[in-house]
């Protein structure tokens, strides 16, 4: 079907998102579980954003990029989870035509931005480890700002094309989407006519946005690993690998789940698999990322304690413990 000669007909005013069909009591359980997951995601990522903003020791490109990535995670998870929570308590589970495509646009734009941000963070680690002497001269404030703007805007600009094309398909009958988000694949399946051009453009966008950033990250870390292996000191090697380990874990979680969704062959239950994989990279991964980034990072853990107001209490407890130990030692001597 030729796109230019196509007549757009929208008799469908809303869609039905089936989500996870189950007994009403299970729907309440799902609501509780995902409410907790969403709250923890917001708290964890907001804590990182505040830590980077308030702690001057974290005003370096690596942590500034991490703070922006955490803010991006908040936006990313907010495009889907609030509507999913509302559907757990709703009997109609409907979403308007405009809201559905708005969710599609923002969800995939933020997801695309995450891929680009992971590339930028890999590039920053490459410069810091492979070009340490030139790092301050290359990673200037202007370059860092430009990379941040690029990371936020690129997905929104590039995903306009597939969203507009899919929204212009004729929808004149079925309106039930067996998913918890407005995913483009079931949306195209609901169209009254098959448009191979739109499907090809969407598939091309997916391939470019998944494989391109992933290959860039692999190449960056291949060079990083070679540079680390040439380091003479074992302590330097451990520090370099520790710095990159958290970022690599996030890359594997995000790109691994996305590629399972869009690259791997279909299973016996493709629809259910799609839901679970989408749930993993849209809800579980943003929940785990704050823990991954702060688990082995002393500077981040110290800054997070300040944000949570626990550092002062920890210091007081340590001082009291030292005081009691010194008193006990003195009494034993006397």
Model-assigned labels for residue ranges:
Residues 1-334:
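Transmembrane helical core of 7TM receptor-like proteins
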């Amino acid at each position: 079907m030729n796109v230019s000669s196509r007549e757009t007909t929208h008799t469908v005013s809303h869609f039905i998102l089936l989500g996870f069909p189950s007994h009403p009591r299970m729907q309440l359980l799902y609501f509780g579980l995902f409410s907790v997951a969403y709250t923890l995601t917001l708290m964890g990522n907001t804590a990182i954003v505040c830590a980077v903003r308030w702690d001057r020791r974290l005003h370096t490109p690596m942590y500034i990029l991490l703070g922006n990535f955490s803010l991006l995670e908040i936006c990313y998870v907010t495009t889907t989870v609030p509507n999913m929570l509302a559907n757990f308590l709703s009997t109609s589970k409907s979403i308007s035509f405009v809201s559905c495509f708005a969710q599609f646009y923002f969800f995939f734009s933020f997801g695309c931005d995450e891929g680009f941000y992971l590339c930028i963070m890999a590039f920053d680690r490459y410069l810091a480890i492979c070009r340490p002497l030139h790092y301050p001269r290359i990673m200037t404030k202007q370059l860092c700002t430009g990379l941040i703007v690029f990371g936020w805007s690129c997905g929104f600009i590039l995903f306009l094309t597939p969203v507009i094309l899919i929204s212009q398909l004729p929808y004149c009958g079925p309106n039930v989407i067996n998913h918890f988000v407005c995913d483009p694949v079931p949306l195209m399946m609901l169209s009254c006519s098959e448009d191979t051009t739109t499907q090809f453009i969407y598939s091309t966008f997916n391939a470019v946005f998944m494989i391109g950033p992933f290959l860039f990250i692999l190449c960056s870390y291949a060079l990083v690993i070679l540079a680390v292996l040439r380091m003479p000191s074992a302590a330097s090697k451990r520090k370099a690998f520790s710095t990159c380990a958290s970022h690599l874990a996030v890359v594997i979680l995000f790109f691994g789940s996305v590629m399972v969704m869009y690259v791997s062959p279909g299973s016996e239950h493709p629809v259910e698999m799609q839901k679970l994989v989408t749930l993993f990279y849209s809800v579980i991964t943003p929940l785990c990322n704050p823990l991954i980034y702060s688990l082995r990072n002393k500077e981040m853990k110290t800054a997070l304690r300040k944000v949570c107001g626990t550092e002062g209490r920890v210091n007081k407890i340590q001082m009291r413990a030292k005081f009691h130990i010194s008193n006990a030692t003195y009494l034993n001597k006397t």
